[in-house]
Structures are given as C-alpha cells and as structure tokens.
A protein has these predicted regions:
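Charged catalytic and DNA/RNA-contacting regions of genome-maintenance
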Residues: 1-210
Length: 210
C-alpha cells in the first residue's frame, strides 16, 4: 500500500493463482474508498509504505477489523524506476512498454504493484513466472456501488455472518461456474456491484445458462 498526500494506491497478488492487480484513489474521499476496497480484498498481509504506515485509521482498520498482518516497507520500492525494474523482472511489464501517464491513478497503481513485485522477489523462494498479467484498474468514479465492511458482512455476499462459510452466502446461491477462472470472475462481480444499468444489462446478456 502506498500513500502520498491525499492519494492511496493498492496492489494485491494471489500466489496460488497468479492474479496480480492494482488500483488507486485520489483526492477527497480517497481514504474511505481505500477502506472499502480493502473490505473487498480482505488481505491477510499488507506491506505499507512509510506514508501509509503513518495513517493510523488505515493501519487500525487493517489490524483490528481485517486481522491483517501489517509489515513496514521503505519508500525505495515505490519509486517509479524501481517499480518498473521489479515488474519487468517478474514478467509483469514489458521493457518497451510505456509508463502510465504522470499524475494518473494508473501510475500510482503501477508503483504499488512494483513495490509488491519487489517484495515477492525478495521473500518468495519460488518461481514467479506464473504471475500476471498485471491489471491496472482505473474505472470511472461511481461505476461501482460503495460497500463498507459492515455492509458486506451483513449482506453475506461471499460468506455467512455466523460461520464465515461460502455455503448460504449470495456467492453460493449464484455460483454455477465450472472453472476456477469463472468462479474468480463471479466472486469479483459480487464483491464490486455495478451501478450503471447499461453495463448491468450487458453483463447479464453475457452470462450463459445451463
């Protein structure tokens, strides 16, 4: 996690599947959006830049609400040049590929992703060639419904409130996918509900039925 001024950036990786994604939030309301995103991702471990570690509300949320292990990081891996080097080394970025525009949310996410790649390269004693592709998320504001941790738990989107199990949750009811990739996709859809009617309709039209 990276923090600078009013801006935040997050990157996440699932080592078992190779999924690697990053997103960023800028300006007013950025911290609230960050907490909502953390509620969706439910990280078990977080690497914090010095700026992020200084945000007591964020670190308390990670430790107390999400039971997440917080590890202090250095500013160096979050620099654009070092982030690019780490991503190229892990096969997540092509050497000839241009950087995201300066000042953009994508560049913030790029820096967070690079710092995570740098951390994994140093700590994981295994081949990382299965990681990727890197997804730099930059959706228009208001595209998704904002749900905080309490709302997510009360709605039992992906696990039940009582037993923290999939069975009985909305995901359990809707998931008729036949592949691991399909399961991950429908889970991601449920965790980030769309708001635009047109996009909702297109998504419904794209779903096949048995």
């Amino acid at each position: 996690m990276y923090h600078d001024g009013e801006d935040y950036a997050l990157a996440r990786c699932d080592l078992s599947t190779g999924q690697f994604a990053a997103c960023a939030f800028q300006g007013e309301g950025a911290q609230a959006k960050l907490l909502n995103q953390l509620s969706a991702w439910l990280p078990s471990e977080a690497i914090l830049s010095p700026g992020a570690e200084s945000q007591e509300e964020v670190t308390a949320f990670l430790r107390d609400r999400l039971d997440c292990l917080c590890q202090p990081g250095q500013d160096g891996p979050f620099r654009t040049d070092r982030a690019r080097k780490a991503l190229i080394s892990c096969g997540l970025w092509l050497e000839e590929e241009p950087l995201p525009p300066e000042g953009s949310r994508k560049l913030l996410g790029f820096r967070a992703a690079g710092a995570l790649a740098d951390y994994l390269a140093q700590t994981q004693k295994t081949d990382l060639s299965h990681l990727g592709p890197l997804v730099l998320e930059e959706e228009p504001e208001g595209q998704y419904m904002e749900l905080d941790l309490t709302a997510r738990r009360n709605l039992e989107l992906t696990e039940t409130l009582r037993n923290q199990e999939k069975r009985g949750s909305l995901l359990w009811v809707l998931d008729r996918t036949r592949t691991a990739m399909g399961h991950r996709m429908i889970r991601a859809w449920i965790e980030r509900p769309l708001r635009a009617p047109g996009r909702i309709t297109r998504r419904q039209d794209a779903v096949g039925t048995p």
